[in-house]
Each structure stands twice: as structure tokens, then as C-alpha cells.
Amino acid sequence: AADVIACENLYSGLVRRTPDGSLAPELCERWEVSADRLTYTFYLKDGLTYTASKGDPSDYAITAEDFVFAFQRMFLPGTNSPYAVEFSALENSAAVLAGQKPASALGVTAAEPLKLVFRLSSPDETFLSKLTLPGAMPCDEAFFDSTRGTYGLTSASTLSSGHFYLYNWTSSGLFLRRAASGNQIDSLRLVENTTSSGQSAEELINNEKCTAALDDSGTPTSLQSVSYSDTTWALLFNCDSIFASTELRQALGSAAASAVEVPGGGLFAEAKGLIPDGLTVDGIDYRQAAGDVRPAFGDP
């Protein structure tokens, strides 16, 4: 989606993913992980500032407090952030999301201006990787408050912490730029397909020379598509050994389904299959049409 592509280029977080798939420091110099893997400490680079629209410098420095504010805002009940579920391992996350504890109780603190500490209630082996998600990007609280509810909705209310900055924002899309460096792309034009021209995403990109276009029409295209999805946790069996028995797998699967307890706080929902609720095919909800495919006690 155009908004996700914009976020990934306008904002940088604590870490970044390299071309070979590994994680490397981005806005931080380094990080440390405790032996029990419940505490992550990041040491931010000194002298970093946000960039305003048109590439103008800003007076807003990037500090540990910006990440604290971003994560606390993520878990405010009124924010309804889709990224809260990704960071459910943070200490007190469910209670904060449910409004049972204040945002300050969330497991993220600024020990020093450039020292950020995350505290987890249980280990999450994918925690570092999740810090590359748009929801984990820094946000200056003073600037956020100054926008009076328009943060990120106009060029004037958008600050960049990434390699690109917002050059222009019109009704048809966004234009991002960065300083020229070698053979690297120094501009991105992101157009949302909301016109009545009937053009597909591929036609918009080819005819209007756009970098990316949002299109939910489902029209086949030879262009690369970028999508995102929620996470489904499932129980998988190695069918090459003792679990080659279908009856045994069904028995264990039904037992696990009946024993699972969905955590409260609104972060999780029970899965009735790999395809979640809300996915429609020709206007028909797939999950409702297919039903619950999980084996039940007493199935032959």
C-alpha cells in the first residue's frame, strides 16, 4: 500500500533489515539483550534530528523519549493501532491497551536521553525484527501536540526520521526525495488510485510514471505487489515420523483447540483456520462460508 511504502521510506527506526536479511543498527549505535531475553537496551546515535517537508532542517532532536511516546501512543485504546498486537510481549501491554493501567506502565522507558530500554513479560524471538515495522518509528511528542490532531495528515504536520523526506503532497499522492548519492534512487512518487479514470495500478505506473500505486481492484498485473497481513499462530506436525497418523494429528489438534485460552486485552482472537474472518470472495465472507475446519472431539 502507498501509505506503508511512504512510512518505510520517510521513517527510520532503531534497526534496519539489510539486503541479506540480517538486522543492523539504524538510529542506534548498538543494542544489548539480557541473558533472560526480557530486557532490550538501545543506545541511540547522538546529534540526530528530524527533517521537515521540502528537506528543511528542524529543531526537533531524535531522542529515546520519542520512542517511548510512540509506543505509549500505540497502546492507547483510542489509537486503535494495528501494530499493538505485534508488540504484545511488552510488559503491561494488554493492561495499558485495555485502559486498566496508564501508558507510563508500558515496558518502554528512556533511561537517559539517548538510552532506551524495553522490558518484556515473556521472550519474543522476533522482537528485534518487529522494530522495523512502521509502528515502531519515533515520534516527537511536542511536535505531535503542535499539530492539533493533524499529525501525518499534511506536509506541514509531517517530520521525517528516514532517508527520504516529504517534498510534496497533493490530492493524487506523495512525492518523496532524498539527497542524491551515486546510483541510488533519489525520488519516489506514490499515487493512490482514487480517480474515476478506470486506470489499473499498472496503467497508472506506466502512463503517469509513478513509483507505486494503491489498487484494491484485484486486476492481474506483471508488476511487483507489496502486501501485508496479520500473524496467525498454528500447531504444525512433522508428518514423517510418529505424527504420520492422521487420527493422532486430529486428536492432538482437537485437544489443543479445546485447551487454548485466548489472552484478554483485545490483542488476540481465536483462529478458525489459516484464512481469517473478514476475507471476502465475490462479496462472500470466506470464513463464514467454509466454517470451522478444525477437528472436534468425536470426529471419525
Locate predicted features:
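Aromatic- and charge-enriched surface segment that lines or borders ligand/interaction sites
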Residues: 30-86
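Gly/Pro-rich hinge or "lid" segments in bacterial periplasmic/extracellular proteins
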Residues: 101-105, 112-115, 119-187
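A bilobed periplasmic-binding-protein/Venus flytrap-type ligand-binding module shared by bacterial periplasmic
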Residues: 177-180, 194, 226-251, 255, ...
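Sec-exported extracytoplasmic/periplasmic mature domains
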Residues: 15, 19, 46-49, 72-80, ...
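Ligand-site clamp/hinge motif
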Residues: 145, 172-220
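A structural "hinge/loop" feature
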Residues: 1-8, 27, 54-60, 125-138, ...
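N-terminal lobe/hinge region of extracytoplasmic solute-binding protein
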Residues: 1-35, 72, 159-160
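Structural transition elements
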Residues: 266-300
